[in-house]
């Protein structure tokens, strides 16, 4: 989406030339003119080719004028918004997220500028783009903003980048209006530690082993039982790992996920206070889930966690409060729950599993994945299992017994 590798069109090439070094007011005016006069195809292409974060930072409003940044943002977020396709709209939002978004309309590019305030022209432009996008295009825009596999996602946008409560309320109201008819699509939500890979309490696998079949399971939950044609990429991780101002935790978590096969996913982090106990962890994750579900009222959700850190409690809370939207809760057992405990949790709608083949069988039983999807998870789990470098023969045999037991639950192919 951002910084396309395709050859630059003449408009993009000229704008890049103008952006080299200091950009004066005449050069800024030429940039605005080039984008304003470009035909629809060229405009969309240019917005996907240019580094818009740099562009928005180069074009300024001045104390005595001209207000070129205001002109540029109004051009893109209002005057020509109807000409823009979803990728170009997402590129604008992304570019604005990567720069300052908390300044007043007095602007901020001259000595003696006012202190940052909420509701500046960048925040208003972001709001304009979302309010000017409807129906399935709005869903596509939100998903495109989420797709960067970095800290600049929808959650960050609405909790950190936009500070004006009035603008935030407008966007949430718009999301609710446009997403009032749920699509039937599911966004899979997952924990990371001892759910995606072994890291804290699970000694059945070597440390930091990605569980066999987990990636295939996420994909099948995303596809759904009808094998929907919409692109994959709805996966979101809800983790207790604490958030902090620098974004380092989120960046490192994204790096770890990419290294282990997750190409695109959003991450919703916890807090230091959320680490006090399992109940606090569950409450913080629930808070993040509720915020996220308001961004995506058109979607349903599934939750995949583990039995070690409050994820089962979170699943119960989700099912109790949002039974129509939470379609399945799957808990990976890493603490050897008793049969009685498993039965009690199942009675509350929480499905406990030992392998991702078992998780897929439970999801298939709930009508969340297809027959062919179930088979794909089984195949992926076997391949993943064979690739693990085990700590001991005993460790491998114990894990193999659980995998074989769950593979026997699958229908013959």
Labelled PLM ranges:
Residues 154-266:
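Glycine- and small hydrophobic-enriched segments that form the cores of compact globular domains
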Residues 218-226, 285-299, 318:
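Short, basic/hydrophobic alpha-helical segments
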Residues 7-190, 394-395, 412:
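Non-catalytic pre-domain segments flanking phosphatase-related domains
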Residues 199-201, 246-252, 311-318, 339-342:
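A short acidic (Asp/Glu
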Residues 216-228, 324-361:
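A short, conserved beta-to-alpha structural element at the edge of catalytic cores
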Residues 248-296:
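A charged nuclease-like catalytic/ligand-binding cleft shared by nucleic-acid processing domains
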Residues 24, 352-413:
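Long, compositionally biased intrinsically disordered regions
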Residues 297-308:
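Conserved Lys-Pro-Asp/Glu-containing loop-to-beta segment of HAD-superfamily phosphomonoesterases
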């Amino acid at each position: 989406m951002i910084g396309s590798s395709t050859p630059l069109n003449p408009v993009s090439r000229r704008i890049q030339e103008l952006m080299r070094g200091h950009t004066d007011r005449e050069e800024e005016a030429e940039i605005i003119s080039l984008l304003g006069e470009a035909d629809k195809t060229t405009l969309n292409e240019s917005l996907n080719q240019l580094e818009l974060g740099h562009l928005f930072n180069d074009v300024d409003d001045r104390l005595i004028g001209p207000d070129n940044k205001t002109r540029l943002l109004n051009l893109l977020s209002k005057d020509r918004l109807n000409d823009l396709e979803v990728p170009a709209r997402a590129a604008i939002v992304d570019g604005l997220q990567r720069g300052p978004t908390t300044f007043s309309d007095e602007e901020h590019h001259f000595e003696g500028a006012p202190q940052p305030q909420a509701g500046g022209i960048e925040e208003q432009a972001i709001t304009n783009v979302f309010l000017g996008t409807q129906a399935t295009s709005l869903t596509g825009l939100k998903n495109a903003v989420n797709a960067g596999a970095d800290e600049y996602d929808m959650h960050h946008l609405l909790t950190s980048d936009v500070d004006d409560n009035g603008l935030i309320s407008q966007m949430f109201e718009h999301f609710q209006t446009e997403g009032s008819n749920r699509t039937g699509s599911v966004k899979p939500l997952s924990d990371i530690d001892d759910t995606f890979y072994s890291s804290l309490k699970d000694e059945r696998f070597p440390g930091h082993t990605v569980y066999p079949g987990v990636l295939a399971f996420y994909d099948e939950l995303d596809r759904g039982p009808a094998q929907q044609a919409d692109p994959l990429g709805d996966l979101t991780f809800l983790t207790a790992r604490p958030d902090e101002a620098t974004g380092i935790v989120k960046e490192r978590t994204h790096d770890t996920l990419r290294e282990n096969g997750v190409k695109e996913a959003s991450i919703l982090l916890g807090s230091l206070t959320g680490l006090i106990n399992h109940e606090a962890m569950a409450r913080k994750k629930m808070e993040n889930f509720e915020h996220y579900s308001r961004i995506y009222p058109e979607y349903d959700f599934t939750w995949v966690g583990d039995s070690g850190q409050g994820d089962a409690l979170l699943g119960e809370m989700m099912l109790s409060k949002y039974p129509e939207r939470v379609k399945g809760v799957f808990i990976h057992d890493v603490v050897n729950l008793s049969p009685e405990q498993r039965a009690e949790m199942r009675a509350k709608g929480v499905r406990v599993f030992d392998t991702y083949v078992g998780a897929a069988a439970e999801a298939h039983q709930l009508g969340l994945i297809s027959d062919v999807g179930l088979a794909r998870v089984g195949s992926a789990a076997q391949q993943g299992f064979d690739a693990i470098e085990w700590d001991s023969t005993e460790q491998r045999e114990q894990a193999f017994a659980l995998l074989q037991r769950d593979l026997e639950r699958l229908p013959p192919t």
